[in-house]
A protein has these predicted regions:
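Metalloprotease/metallohydrolase-associated module, dominated by Zn2+-dependent proteases
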Residues: 2-72, 96-248
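Short, conserved micro-motifs enriched in small and acidic residues
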Residues: 73-77, 81
Length: 248
């Protein structure tokens, strides 16, 4: 029987979790229940003991991933979010947590040990601990190497949300051990964003205007209006007033 989309995606996430648990956490993590959540302005989150078996025999932590960002992040970046949340789980079971939502030095040290550099900006030079934290991938670090090996083994995150969001945070680049940026493609080359957009399966980038859409331009002096293609503001001039037309 062919696996359903749900089975396929969850098996891939479960497999990635188990793989990172072995190679980055020495098999210490107890497992969890995975969910897909479109929570605003977050790539994912961890919640301890969030689920309880209905008969009371057993409970499970939750790790959530936000599918709205799958299409606009490379696979290893989404996997780095999974590993980030696994560090939270490791600390919940084996470390000492600080107040709710605060990322302390112990968490930061564990992140760095698996090859993810904590940073409040997502870039070198950011604070290593604090309330609002993200990270960047260290080139050649344990996570960088293990995620590449995992992706080479086969399909990973093969289903993407067709209603996508642009990445709102900085954790999208790869940096070397000294903090120098490593060149990389801005989007996963296995995902054809243009094709999906043309097919109506993705929302077009709001930052790019369709050249076929006409814009209204106004002379700021005599208030004469005209319509033309996008990008003409300041480039065309009112003959009567000798001033450029502007967006209106």
């Amino acid at each position: 029987m062919t696996a359903t989309a749900s089975q396929e995606l969850y098996e891939e996430i479960e497999g990635a979790y188990a793989y990172f648990n072995e190679v980055l956490f020495d098999g210490q993590l107890p497992g969890c229940l995975f969910t897909l959540q479109r929570k605003s302005n977050t790539f994912g989150y961890y919640s301890e003991s969030r689920f309880l078996r209905r008969n009371g025999e057993g409970k499970s932590d939750e790790i959530a991933l936000n599918p709205a960002y799958f299409a606009h992040r490379r696979v290893e970046q989404t996997l780095s979010t999974l590993a980030h949340e696994q560090v939270h789980q490791w600390q919940a079971h084996f470390g000492k947590r600080s107040r709710s939502g605060y990322h302390n030095a112990e968490w930061a040290n564990k992140m760095q040990s698996i090859g993810l550099m904590p940073s409040d900006t997502g870039e070198p030079g950011g604070k290593r601990h604090g309330q609002q934290m993200t990270h960047y991938i260290i080139e050649g670090g344990p996570f960088d190497l293990s995620s590449k090996e995992l992706i080479e083994q086969g399909r990973m995150l093969s289903w993407i949300d067709v209603v996508t969001k642009r990445v709102p945070m900085s954790a999208v680049l790869l940096y070397g051990p000294g903090g120098e940026p490593v060149p990389g493609t801005p989007e996963d080359p296995t995902i054809d964003i243009s094709a999906l957009t043309s097919a109506g399966l993705l929302q077009p980038d709001p930052g790019k205007e369709d050249p076929k859409n006409k814009r209204k331009y106004t002379c700021p002096s005599c208030h004469l209006n005209l319509w033309g293609k996008p990008g003409l503001s300041g480039r065309i001039q009112c003959i009567e007033c000798a001033v450029p037309f502007m967006d209106s």
